[in-house]
Amino acid sequence: GAWITPAEWDSHITTEDFPTGVPSILAVDSSVDDARYVGVHAAVIDNQAIVKVAFVVQTENEMWEHIERIMADQKVQLAITPTLEIHLPMNLQRRYQTVGYGELLRFSSLVRSMILEGKVRHNGEKMLAEHVCRAVITKTAQGVVLSSQKSPGPIELCRCMTWAVALVSKPKQATKPMLVITG
């Protein structure tokens, strides 16, 4: 069935600006037909994730240009699918992780619960809303997962939002670890 209803998604719109200079996740994916590359950016403010569409472009080159621009902020971490990972620039090698079906399986119900509990905010972008509200969740032997096959249209922005929200909401160490040198 439907993952999130339009009324539910719309009830979490915020006018708050997306924060800068805070730890954040940029999740990137390509559409099923590789005709489109998308990125969703997520950060946490006051214990709530805030998400926005970072880009929707037609070529891989444009995608990398957007990724480089956004990741000029050293606090941004990249979550990218294995298909695109092979072309990851050397300067970003230390700030990324791969995400795919396994992570969707782990995070789909978690992020749905976060949305229903009001822990995910967005600024009402139409395309993101369309992808989120058309996404269909299916039951598998391993759990529930967002299904591109069962959804009546593209959901890559929803997939990226799911990865970004789950990863950015993971508790972080507030202070830098101390370097201890012993005798």
Report each predicted region and the residues it spans.
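Mg2+-dependent endonuclease catalytic cores in nucleic-acid-processing enzymes, primarily RNase H-like
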Residues: 46-143
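Short, Φ-rich (hydrophobic/aromatic) sequence segments
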Residues: 32, 36-38, 104-115, 162-164
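Acidic active-site catalytic centers that drive phospho-/nucleotidyl reactions
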Residues: 29, 81, 156
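ATPase catalytic-site recognition across NTP-hydrolyzing enzymes
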Residues: 1-28
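Short hydrophobic beta-strand segments
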Residues: 25-29, 78, 122, 147
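Long hydrophobic segments that form regular secondary structure
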Residues: 18-36, 41-45
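Charge-patterned, long linear interaction tracts outside catalytic cores
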Residues: 138-183
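Short, glycine-/Ser/Thr-/acidic-enriched flexible segments
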Residues: 31-33, 44-47, 84-86, 151-153, ...
